[in-house]
Structure formats: structure tokens, C-alpha cells
Amino acid sequence: MKTKLNELLEFPTPFTYKVMGQALPELVDQVVEVVQRHAPGDYTPTVKPSSKGNYHSVSITINATHIEQVETLYEELGKIDIVRMVL
């Protein structure tokens, strides 16, 4: 049984993205830049390195106002060259 995300969420709502990418200094800036375009705000993402240090996990929470915003951000964050996965 498939459940649509928009049926589970009531907007506006806090929504956290977890972005995994290469451990490069520009990763956080690129993630925040994309988020700012679709959900302007003051963000302080949490960054955690992988066990071997090759990747970083960037967690960032937005105040989502509609499902299209959530879906667009998944798509746009995934287009960043150094990003490997968006959860």
C-alpha cells in the first residue's frame, strides 16, 4: 500500500532534509544556497562526517508551506554535483 507524502503532512510544517555528499568545504554552502531559493530563512545546518571522512551528512530543517516546495527541494538538492543522496 502506497501512501502519498502530502497525505501524511499538514502544512505549514517543519521538514528536515538530510543531504549526503562529498566531504568538500563548499557542500554546506551549496545546500544552503539551494534551500534559500525555495524557502528563504536563517539556516544553521548540522554537519556530520562519515566514518572514513570521505562524505558529509548535512541536515537542514525548513518550514515547508506546501508539498510542491518539498518535492522541488528534493529535486534541486539532488542536482548538486557533489551530492550523492537526499533523504
UniProtKB/Swiss-Prot annotation:
Q: Which GO terms describe its cellular component?
A: cytosol
List GO BP terms, alphabetically. Answer: cellular response to heat
**Family matches, as InterPro entries:** UPF0250_YbeD-like, YbeD-like_sf
Q: Which family does it belong to?
A: Belongs to the UPF0250 family.
**Which named protein is this?**
UPF0250 protein YbeD
List the gene name. ybeD
